[in-house]
Amino acid sequence: MIPEQTNHVVSTIENLPAESISASPGPLHRMRNVFSREMLLSVALGQVLSLLICGIRLTSKYLSEDFHANTPLFQSFLNYILLFLVYTTTLAVRQGEENLLAILKRRWWKYMFLGIIDIEATYLVVKAHQYTTFISIQLLNCFVIPVVILLSWFFLLVRYKVLHFIGAIACILGIGCMAGADVLMGRQQKGDFYPGDSKLIGDVLVLGGATLYGISSVCQEYIVRNLSRVELLGMIGLFGSFFSGIQLAIMEHKELLKVPWDWQIGLLYVGFTACMFGLYSFMPVVIKKTSATAINLSMLTAELYTFFCGLFLFHYKFSGLYLLSFFTILLGLVFYFSTNTYVAQDPRVYKQFRNPSGPVVELPSSGQLEPSVTYTSLSQETEEEPRVRVA
């Protein structure tokens, strides 16, 4: 008996339906993938934070140079009081597990340390202006970038790609270009008056402040992703106002008595507090949308916005290097946001900010733990990233 033969139909490119043949993407399509709406939105949100920092620096400059009101602790204290009035009182009137007392019962000491870190980060950088040059502060402030990247890698389990590192390096090169422009245009006039030991102290203060900023940023990212923005700001307002008030009473009460109060100074304090409150309120939103690393890269443009305003307000000299610096930082941001980071979800990692009195999950004692890697997306791509299993 002859076995029945099966007919096999071979599909070639000629007999496939036209809609099943996808042409290779052209340059315009690739540009749209890179400059997606989500990527442009992420860059724009970071620039809003930079503009708020610009407002903070301009009002501080007017207060210190024109009115001789050197009160950085008092200015921060006003912001913490406003955070307390808005967000801490919101927590106080809530019911259940999100109530202020319930949060304090579970996590009070963690937020206490976060509040102290937030206060001292600002204080160290402001104090460094008395010991070292402005250009040194510009350059050493970039130390916050590797701090945030390392902390995000080890504690938030964020994994980066090559383009992320290229973007970060480009942003730091932009800051270096801006510092070079400051030297060429003579904006640094006090640098020769700082003795070596004094300058070393100032540089150490900047590095310490940048490190504390990095720790604070990573803690904020964890809290807004796992808890809530209102809880974060309410706790910072509570502990920040308490500890900054104590530090103000000890270290700055004499300076506060020397302030020549009038309506102009009052208006500058109001403007500073409004910008600072807006920065603190909006930053958790941007962190949740992007990441702690992304916002610290985005805020590198704040110094350039301050310079551009200074062209009209303080008659700074212009140089094309400032524009080159600005576009170099923006190019670095485009590189950084053009691809997605991903988060390794390891079951061996214990969530430290969770309620320690909650139920304990038993991990299997036998067998090899296989942490998975989950990709997070900042774009509207529909293509799914592969799931990776780590042996």
From Swiss-Prot:
It is a multi-pass membrane protein. Keywords: Membrane, Transmembrane, Transmembrane helix, Transport. Its main location: membrane. GO terms for molecular function: transmembrane transporter activity. Putative solute transporter. InterPro entries: SLC35_F1/F2/F6, SLC35F_Transporter. Residues 361-391 are annotated as: Disordered. This is Solute carrier family 35 member F2. It comes from Xenopus tropicalis (Western clawed frog). The keyword Ribonucleoprotein does not apply. One of its GO terms (cellular component) is membrane. The chain crosses the membrane at residues 39-59, 73-93, 108-128, 137-157, 165-185, 200-220, 230-250, 267-287, 294-314, 318-338.
